[in-house]
């Protein structure tokens, strides 16, 4: 059950990855770098908390 948030965050990261059909930027576009940083830090926090209790749940990453 602890792994569910980790998988949800991974799915969100995959869904927000740039694609070949990317639209050109407009002045209303928001840069995605802060969103990626927040998701990365949330994933690291969940991974650390999860790995302390369930070693099989650990996600390997940099």
UniProtKB/Swiss-Prot annotation:
Q: Show which residues constitute the signal peptide.
A: 1-22
| Name used for this protein in its record | Conotoxin Tx5.1
CC annotations in GO: extracellular region
Q: Domains: what does the record tell us? A: The cysteine framework is V (CC-CC).
What the entry lists under InterPro entries is as follows:
T-conotoxin
Cellular localization per UniProt: Secreted
- The chain residues annotated with the modification Glutamine amide are 60
Q: Which UniProt keywords apply?
A: Amidation, Disulfide bond, Secreted, Signal, Toxin
- The answer, when asked if Transmembrane is one of the entry's keywords, is no
Q: Output the lineage of the source organism.
A: Eukaryota, Metazoa, Spiralia, Lophotrochozoa, Mollusca
Q: Which residues form the propeptide?
A: 23-49
* Expressing tissues: Expressed by the venom duct.
Q: Which family does it belong to?
A: Belongs to the conotoxin T superfamily.
Q: Does the keyword Zinc apply?
A: no
Recount the PTM note.
Answer: Contains 2 disulfide bonds that can be either 'C1-C3, C2-C4' or 'C1-C4, C2-C3', since these disulfide connectivities have been observed for conotoxins with cysteine framework V (for examples, see AC P0DQQ7 and AC P81755).
Q: Which GO terms describe its molecular function?
A: toxin activity
């Amino acid at each position: 059950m602890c792994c569910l948030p980790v998988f949800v965050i991974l799915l969100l990261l995959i869904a927000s990855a740039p694609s070949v059909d990317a639209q050109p930027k407009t002045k209303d576009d928001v840069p995605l770098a802060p969103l990626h940083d927040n998701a990365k830090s949330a994933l690291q926090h969940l991974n650390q908390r999860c790995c302390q209790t369930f070693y099989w749940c650990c996600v390997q990453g940099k």
